[in-house]
Amino acid sequence: MLKKLLKMNLFLIIILFFTSAITTAKESPSDEDIDRARKMVKLLDDLYKTFIELITEEYVKNPALLPAATLSKRVFEVMEEKGWHKARLLDATGTPFNPDNNPKDAFERDAINAFAWGNSYIERVENIEGKDYLRAATSLTAVTEGCTICHPGKKVGDLLGAISYTIPLQE
């Protein structure tokens, strides 16, 4: 009788273990989560590129000001410190002013390669340290003559780099 009871308890423990493992297993991000992150990237990209263009216009008038790349990187750092998202400037010229702007992983290298072939957007969902993120990148081109002050040898329309975004998919 005791053996039968122990076997039954062991059986129940095993069932509970597997049931628990199944119910706590991490689900894939939903389409809604991915769509929300895409919209966030679109909004951030518009905001950051507008910021870069406006700062560049002011820098042209007063070169004593900090350049757009320096200010953008600082804004990106503050947003990450506040826990919102991660954004990085990436170099696509092969000769970055700052080596920190070189692509750091496969996604960023793939983005720069895609932009060199004429694409302007790339994305993928990645699991980083157990959490799902939308990784997205958008191309940065010289949009005004002012861009050529810091990017000599480039002209309006030339690819300069990218902004890489890492947006969490679950709250």
Question: Can you name each region flagged by the protein language model?
Answer:
Residues 1-11:
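Bacterial N-terminal signal peptides that target proteins for export
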Residues 2, 19-22:
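A broad helix-preferring feature
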Residues 9-19:
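Bacterial N-terminal signal peptides
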